[in-house]
Amino acid sequence: RNRVDKDKNGKIDYVLIEGEEDHYDAIRRTKGFLENSKDLPLNTLGTLSASWNRQLAYKKFSQLDNNAISSTEAVICNNDDMALGVYDYYKEKNLALPIILGINNSQEMNEKIMSGEIYGSVDNNMDNQVLRIVKCMESVLNGNTKKYKKVWYSTPYAVTRE
């Protein structure tokens, strides 16, 4: 946790990026994450809706105030495209990347995970995705990112760091 908890407040300060505001999957993913992570030491800096869109996620994230952006230690996204939009923002601004988590099983996310730039993504499997996102956050909180080899939970892929 110490490596990720930059401000040493004992919590991971995160931004949650949802899909469409009234979309069933976005509601379910967000509700599931919030319910399953309630016992984790997390602090929500903001919740944005980006309609599953990379460019919109970039735009909405860039509209957060500078303090929220600089305080962000993790970004949890309802899909990989929105996670990549946040990644694009950090890269364009030459900022250190926070922990970024997505959902979907996209090839580009796989490449970013393998390069070590993005922490992880989980399979678009309704039964398991929320629990796996929470498990990823637990590993981050416990400082087990090096030991936690399987960072991409997705059928047919299971990407592991060597």
What is the predicted role of each segment?
Residues 33, 45-46, 50-111:
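Hydrophobic alpha-helical
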Residues 12, 73, 119:
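Conserved acidic residues
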